[in-house]
């Protein structure tokens, strides 16, 4: 599937080079994640993709839906994943990942859902209230709020012109960060708003009249996965519970002139009995 779209300048596929690069990273002890683009082709093969990654011992994955517009027509390209297809893909991928509550692979989206279910903030930017997780810095020093918005409209400045902290505090940067904070339209009453938080701005307004291109896919997936996410979260919460404190027991009673039960060899009235008789402040 990789070589269908990722072709080198000489017309050859790049899959062999990518796998060679991964082996070099492994040989050097460098940790890495795999970014997987879900397009019209790969969207039909979640099982084959999962099996390949598991067999290849690639355990840290991130799946990103391909949604591209044709610049000439404004319509969604033929190679983009379709909403229904993406929903099917996520549901089946989750079924494989779940593994009876003991996942063998880290998939970023699923891991974030578990984190949120145990009360931790999401790490994925699309699942956060504001789009301010990072800034993109290009080779020439140009800065942008997101790698999906590297364009003239959202150029925030250049590191050769002003320091990074000034760019991060710029009103334009803050505007982008806050654009998704207030629920709009049907999102206001959506049962999944607390998880989705209106999703990624990249997929908004791709099709006239539809706020988020992959909204229907996410709704279907959340409904499919929610019970098992809750099961994993409950197990993690149980593991985090501290061991109960041992029950408090009172010292055995003894007569005043008997040997003290603590084993000191002294009479009770001159040892623990005296302490017990002392008034407390």
PLM region spans:
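Secondary-structure capping and boundary motifs in well-ordered enzyme cores
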Residues: 132-135, 252-254
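Flexible mid-to-C-terminal extensions adjoining Fe-S/redox cofactors in radical SAM and related proteins
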Residues: 150-256, 270-281
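Radical SAM enzyme [4Fe-4S]-AdoMet core and its adjacent flexible, acidic
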Residues: 3-16, 23-126, 130, 136, ...
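Extracellular repeat turn/loop positions enriched in glycine and acidic/polar residues, especially those
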Residues: 263-265
């Amino acid at each position: 599937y990789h070589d269908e779209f990722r072709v080198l300048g000489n017309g050859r596929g790049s899959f062999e080079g990518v796998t060679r690069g991964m082996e070099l990273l492994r040989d050097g002890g460098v940790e890495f994640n795999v970014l997987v683009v879900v397009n019209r082709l790969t969207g039909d093969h979640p099982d084959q993709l999962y099996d390949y990654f598991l067999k290849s011992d690639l355990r840290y994955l991130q799946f990103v839906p391909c949604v591209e517009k044709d610049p000439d027509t404004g319509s969604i390209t033929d190679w983009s994943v379709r909403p229904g297809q993406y929903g099917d893909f996520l549901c089946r991928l989750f079924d494989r990942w779940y593994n009876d509550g003991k996942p063998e692979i880290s998939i970023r989206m699923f891991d974030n859902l578990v984190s949120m279910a145990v009360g931790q903030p999401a790490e994925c930017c699309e699942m956060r209230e504001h789009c301010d997780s990072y800034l993109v810095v290009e080779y020439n020093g140009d800065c942008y709020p997101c790698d999906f918005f590297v364009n003239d409209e959202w150029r925030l400045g250049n590191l050769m012109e002003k320091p990074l902290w000034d760019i991060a505090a710029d009103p334009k940067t803050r505007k982008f960060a806050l654009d998704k904070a207030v629920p709009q339209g049907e999102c206001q009453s959506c049962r999944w708003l607390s998880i989705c938080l209106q999703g990624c701005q990249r997929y908004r307004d791709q099709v006239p009249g539809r706020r988020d291109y992959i909204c229907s896919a996410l709704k279907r997936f959340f409904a499919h996965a929610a019970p098992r996410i809750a099961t994993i979260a409950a197990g993690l919460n149980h593991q985090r519970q501290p061991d109960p404190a041992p029950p408090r027991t009172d010292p055995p009673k003894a007569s005043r002139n008997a040997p003290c039960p603590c084993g000191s060899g002294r009479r009770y009235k001159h040892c623990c009995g005296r302490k017990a008789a002392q008034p407390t402040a």
